[in-house]
Amino acid sequence: MTTSIIERIDAWAEKTPDFPCYEYAGTRLSYKELKRQSDALGSYLLKNLKTDKEKPIIVYGHMSPLMIIAFLGAIKSGRAYVPVDFSMPVERIEQIKKAADPALFICTEELPENLTITDCPVLNAENLVDALEKHFDEKPDPTSCVKNDDNYYIIYTSGSTGNPKGVQISQNNLVSFSNWILQDFSLQQGLRFLNQAPFSFDLSVMDLYPCLLSGGTLVPMDKTITSNLKDLYHEIPAQSFDVWVSTPSFADLCLLDPNFNQENNPNLTRFLFCGEVLAKKTARELLVRFPDAVIYNTYGPTEATVAVTQVRITAELIDAYPSLPLGVIKPDMRLHIIDQETGDVLPDGEKGEIVLIGASVSKGYLNEPEKTDQVFFDYKGYQAYHTGDSGIIKDGYLFFQGRLDFQIKLHGYRIELEDIENNLKKVSLIQNCAIIPKMKDGKVDMLVAQVIPSPNDFTKEYQLSAAIKNELKEFMPTYMIPRKWIYKTEFPLTMNGKIDRKALNQEVNK
């Protein structure tokens, strides 16, 4: 059982000093070097930063080894870090800087030319490397390290007002999450982990910390690789992954390659999915292609430290339910389904809002007390969070029922878009899909289905559409069937590896 993230990671510098903790673009970082360089940075920060330790450190960059050195260096100086990926627009970076009010801006890559930082000290990449060299072999005071309920990291998520919200995750939150992942998912020492998500997306926490805590090797697939399918399909088998952590959409992208299978990836025996709904088709295809692998579906919002439920996906489970379960809650958490109107806890089998209670729940949004009070609350002495997700419990499993705010009204009918997508994914002719409402005069005019079709013998798109509609009529009411159909070979993905619904929406609502 881990009680201190830093102590456990640093211990590998003694046990396996030369083992690589990180491999990126031909460079290897050993556990010994990770400790030495993060110690050096921690010492530098303790000597040079005199502002309040409540102020976090922004770490800007992408996937270079300097990113995790900066993360751990910040922690050793007693400050939380805020990861900011270099793919973020300048306006977004400025919003995060303003909201976080950081003590320092560490840059592992060059800042955009049109971004000027004047009200906060900046440590650029050149000066960062210089600081690491000058403080070679210095060790920070271990009592200065982030501990217990101190903030460990702060990740900014989209806010309904357009301004990002900083979710505060403490050392205790991360310890709870990490112990659960390492135990329930049987992650042994020395495994190679895929890092698909940028560090500004909390899915990355699911590979970064379980990897470092178990003495493994983190192997990032950066934007230059994931944006080029030919490079991606070549790189995956070359990296000999043991553990796959990604969104389902990223796996769907890889499944387009017929060579993505056990034969070409013999070590790949664990798939961990989070961040999106895992479709039955995706899970079934992975079980066929990777007979030696175990597949886990997980669920959790950023506000509850990445994930709080898990279930191992089997062929029997796929056949047993209309959609895949999200699993069972982790041992130190409680999950309630509540009536959104009355707040009453609902019995199993009734649909309501998912409320999470316990050790994984964040203390709230940084410097946002009003927004915090809207969704976080105390439940019998435990921190609790209104997820805004709709769910139902059947046979002890949690099932996702869509977002409470992802409903539309069409011709008087209240419709959940995820409900339509889940039904479309049952159709044999559909591999993946996204439903986009077409707007007219401020209201929904019709539903547009963007579809990646399964291989078929139709020569005309209208023939394919007719066949899909005919199959849909068996289990979906007519008013829910999309009126327009757009066919694609692949979907655009966000930097986090999710379907880029904003881009699809712009395409439909030009």
From Swiss-Prot:
Residues where D-alanine binds? 202, 306, 498
Q: Which cysteines are joined by disulfide bonds?
A: none
The GO annotation for biological process reads: lipoteichoic acid biosynthetic process
Instruction: List the catalysed reactions.
Output: holo-[D-alanyl-carrier protein] + D-alanine + ATP = D-alanyl-[D-alanyl-carrier protein] + AMP + diphosphate
Its primary localisation, in coarse terms, equals: cytoplasm
Name the Pfam families for this protein. Answer: AMP-binding, AMP-binding_C
Q: Name one GO cellular component term.
A: cytoplasm
InterPro entries for this protein: AA_adenyl_dom, AMP-bd_C, AMP-bd_C_sf, AMP-binding_CS, AMP-dep_synth/lig_dom, ANL_N_sf, DltA, DltA-like
Q: Cellular location of this protein?
A: Cytoplasm
- UniProt xrefs under CDD domains: DltA (cd05945)
Q: In which pathway does it act?
A: Cell wall biogenesis; lipoteichoic acid biosynthesis
Instruction: Fetch the SUPFAM superfamilies from UniProt.
Output: Acetyl-CoA synthetase-like (SSF56801)
Q: Which family does it belong to?
A: Belongs to the ATP-dependent AMP-binding enzyme family. DltA subfamily.
What the protein does? Catalyzes the first step in the D-alanylation of lipoteichoic acid (LTA), the activation of D-alanine and its transfer onto the D-alanyl carrier protein (Dcp) DltC. In an ATP-dependent two-step reaction, forms a high energy D-alanyl-AMP intermediate, followed by transfer of the D-alanyl residue as a thiol ester to the phosphopantheinyl prosthetic group of the Dcp. D-alanylation of LTA plays an important role in modulating the properties of the cell wall in Gram-positive bacteria, influencing the net charge of the cell wall.
| Listed name of the protein | D-alanine--D-alanyl carrier protein ligase
